[in-house]
Regions:
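Divalent metal-cofactor coordination and adjacent catalytic microenvironments
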Residues: 2-180
Length: 180
Protein backbone atom coordinates (compact mmCIF):
# COMPACT_ATOMS: atom_id res chain seq x y z
CA UNK A 1 0.00 0.00 0.00
CA UNK A 2 1.04 3.56 -0.66
CA UNK A 3 1.63 5.57 2.48
CA UNK A 4 1.43 9.35 2.33
CA UNK A 5 3.80 11.24 4.57
CA UNK A 6 2.34 14.25 6.33
CA UNK A 7 3.73 17.59 5.20
CA UNK A 8 5.99 19.27 7.73
CA UNK A 9 6.64 23.00 7.86
CA UNK A 10 10.17 24.32 8.30
CA UNK A 11 9.98 28.11 8.72
CA UNK A 12 13.54 28.69 9.93
CA UNK A 13 14.60 32.18 8.78
CA UNK A 14 17.59 31.77 6.44
CA UNK A 15 17.32 28.00 6.90
CA UNK A 16 18.92 25.76 4.30
CA UNK A 17 15.94 23.38 4.54
CA UNK A 18 13.19 25.96 5.02
CA UNK A 19 10.03 25.39 2.99
CA UNK A 20 7.77 28.11 4.40
CA UNK A 21 7.95 31.72 5.51
CA UNK A 22 5.43 31.12 8.28
CA UNK A 23 4.51 28.45 10.79
CA UNK A 24 1.09 26.84 10.94
CA UNK A 25 0.56 28.61 14.28
CA UNK A 26 1.20 31.99 12.62
CA UNK A 27 -1.21 31.12 9.81
CA UNK A 28 -3.93 30.02 12.21
CA UNK A 29 -3.46 33.24 14.23
CA UNK A 30 -3.70 35.34 11.06
CA UNK A 31 -6.96 33.69 10.05
CA UNK A 32 -8.45 34.50 13.45
CA UNK A 33 -8.31 38.15 12.32
CA UNK A 34 -10.08 37.89 8.95
CA UNK A 35 -13.82 38.26 8.30
CA UNK A 36 -14.32 34.67 7.08
CA UNK A 37 -11.93 32.16 8.58
CA UNK A 38 -14.06 29.10 7.80
CA UNK A 39 -12.30 28.58 4.46
CA UNK A 40 -9.09 27.99 6.43
CA UNK A 41 -10.46 26.49 9.63
CA UNK A 42 -12.23 23.68 7.75
CA UNK A 43 -8.93 22.24 6.45
CA UNK A 44 -6.90 19.52 8.16
CA UNK A 45 -3.44 20.26 9.56
CA UNK A 46 -1.89 18.36 6.64
CA UNK A 47 -3.96 20.29 4.05
CA UNK A 48 -2.92 23.57 5.65
CA UNK A 49 0.76 22.58 5.74
CA UNK A 50 0.68 21.49 2.09
CA UNK A 51 -1.03 24.73 1.08
CA UNK A 52 1.53 26.82 2.99
CA UNK A 53 4.42 24.97 1.34
CA UNK A 54 2.84 25.30 -2.12
CA UNK A 55 2.23 29.02 -1.57
CA UNK A 56 5.90 29.47 -0.64
CA UNK A 57 6.99 27.75 -3.84
CA UNK A 58 4.82 30.06 -5.90
CA UNK A 59 6.05 33.15 -4.06
CA UNK A 60 9.61 31.98 -4.67
CA UNK A 61 8.94 31.61 -8.41
CA UNK A 62 9.32 35.37 -8.86
CA UNK A 63 12.44 37.49 -9.22
CA UNK A 64 12.96 39.98 -6.39
CA UNK A 65 15.07 43.07 -5.80
CA UNK A 66 18.01 42.86 -3.45
CA UNK A 67 20.01 39.80 -2.49
CA UNK A 68 19.47 36.70 -0.38
CA UNK A 69 21.01 37.23 3.03
CA UNK A 70 22.85 33.89 3.06
CA UNK A 71 24.06 31.89 0.08
CA UNK A 72 22.81 28.69 1.70
CA UNK A 73 19.27 29.81 2.50
CA UNK A 74 16.62 27.76 0.71
CA UNK A 75 14.06 30.53 0.22
CA UNK A 76 14.26 33.92 -1.48
CA UNK A 77 13.56 35.83 1.74
CA UNK A 78 14.97 37.33 3.86
CA UNK A 79 16.77 39.71 1.51
CA UNK A 80 19.00 42.74 1.89
CA UNK A 81 20.39 45.58 -0.24
CA UNK A 82 16.90 46.88 -0.99
CA UNK A 83 14.44 49.28 0.62
CA UNK A 84 10.65 49.28 0.68
CA UNK A 85 9.00 52.55 1.74
CA UNK A 86 12.41 53.85 2.78
CA UNK A 87 13.04 50.93 5.15
CA UNK A 88 15.99 48.62 4.46
CA UNK A 89 15.04 44.94 4.35
CA UNK A 90 16.36 43.01 7.34
CA UNK A 91 18.17 39.68 7.33
CA UNK A 92 16.56 38.85 10.67
CA UNK A 93 12.93 38.63 9.59
CA UNK A 94 10.51 37.97 6.78
CA UNK A 95 8.65 41.11 5.60
CA UNK A 96 5.04 41.18 6.82
CA UNK A 97 3.64 41.53 3.29
CA UNK A 98 5.44 38.35 2.23
CA UNK A 99 3.75 36.57 5.13
CA UNK A 100 0.35 38.05 4.22
CA UNK A 101 0.83 36.88 0.64
CA UNK A 102 1.63 33.38 1.85
CA UNK A 103 -1.38 33.25 4.19
CA UNK A 104 -3.83 34.36 1.53
CA UNK A 105 -2.32 32.32 -1.29
CA UNK A 106 -2.27 29.21 0.90
CA UNK A 107 -5.96 29.66 1.68
CA UNK A 108 -6.75 30.19 -2.00
CA UNK A 109 -4.78 27.10 -3.06
CA UNK A 110 -6.31 24.97 -0.29
CA UNK A 111 -9.80 25.87 -1.52
CA UNK A 112 -9.18 25.55 -5.27
CA UNK A 113 -6.56 22.92 -5.96
CA UNK A 114 -7.05 23.22 -9.75
CA UNK A 115 -6.63 27.00 -9.87
CA UNK A 116 -3.07 26.92 -11.17
CA UNK A 117 -2.80 23.59 -12.98
CA UNK A 118 -6.27 23.63 -14.49
CA UNK A 119 -8.55 20.66 -14.86
CA UNK A 120 -7.86 17.50 -16.82
CA UNK A 121 -9.65 14.94 -18.92
CA UNK A 122 -13.02 15.88 -20.38
CA UNK A 123 -12.81 19.34 -18.88
CA UNK A 124 -9.97 20.62 -21.08
CA UNK A 125 -9.87 23.74 -23.26
CA UNK A 126 -11.60 22.20 -26.30
CA UNK A 127 -15.00 20.56 -26.01
CA UNK A 128 -15.41 19.68 -29.70
CA UNK A 129 -13.34 19.83 -32.89
CA UNK A 130 -14.43 18.99 -36.47
CA UNK A 131 -12.39 18.85 -39.66
CA UNK A 132 -15.09 19.19 -42.34
CA UNK A 133 -16.04 22.90 -42.43
CA UNK A 134 -13.49 23.34 -39.63
CA UNK A 135 -15.31 23.92 -36.36
CA UNK A 136 -13.80 24.24 -32.87
CA UNK A 137 -15.82 24.66 -29.68
CA UNK A 138 -14.02 25.77 -26.55
CA UNK A 139 -14.98 25.04 -22.97
CA UNK A 140 -15.46 28.36 -21.23
CA UNK A 141 -15.58 27.09 -17.67
CA UNK A 142 -12.35 25.16 -17.92
CA UNK A 143 -8.70 25.82 -18.24
CA UNK A 144 -6.36 23.15 -19.53
CA UNK A 145 -3.32 21.89 -17.69
CA UNK A 146 -0.37 24.19 -18.12
CA UNK A 147 -2.33 27.09 -19.57
CA UNK A 148 -1.58 29.46 -16.69
CA UNK A 149 1.65 31.33 -17.33
CA UNK A 150 1.71 33.46 -14.24
CA UNK A 151 0.15 32.99 -10.83
CA UNK A 152 -0.63 36.72 -10.91
CA UNK A 153 -3.09 35.99 -13.74
CA UNK A 154 -5.07 33.77 -11.37
CA UNK A 155 -4.56 35.80 -8.19
CA UNK A 156 -3.93 39.43 -9.22
CA UNK A 157 -4.35 40.57 -5.60
CA UNK A 158 -0.91 39.08 -4.88
CA UNK A 159 0.52 42.18 -6.56
CA UNK A 160 -0.60 44.30 -3.60
CA UNK A 161 1.51 42.17 -1.25
CA UNK A 162 4.50 41.30 -3.43
CA UNK A 163 4.73 44.15 -5.94
CA UNK A 164 7.08 46.39 -3.94
CA UNK A 165 9.64 43.58 -3.73
CA UNK A 166 9.34 42.20 -7.25
CA UNK A 167 11.63 42.95 -10.13
CA UNK A 168 9.22 43.70 -12.96
CA UNK A 169 5.95 43.69 -11.01
CA UNK A 170 3.20 41.25 -11.90
CA UNK A 171 4.78 40.13 -15.14
CA UNK A 172 7.92 39.06 -13.35
CA UNK A 173 9.26 36.80 -16.06
CA UNK A 174 12.20 39.08 -16.54
CA UNK A 175 15.87 38.39 -16.15
CA UNK A 176 18.16 40.66 -14.21
CA UNK A 177 21.04 41.83 -16.43
CA UNK A 178 24.27 42.81 -14.72
CA UNK A 179 26.69 44.76 -16.81
CA UNK A 180 30.23 44.88 -15.65
Amino acid sequence: TLSIVAATINATVKGENANSYVTLTEANSYFETVPDSTTWDNKTVDQKNRALIAATRWIDSFVYYGDRCDDGQALKFPRNNYQVDGVELSCDLIPQNIKYAQFELARALANDTDAITGTTGKEGNISEAKLGDLEVKFNTASQGTGSVNNIMDVYPWLQSYLGAYMLGGAGSYQVRVVRG
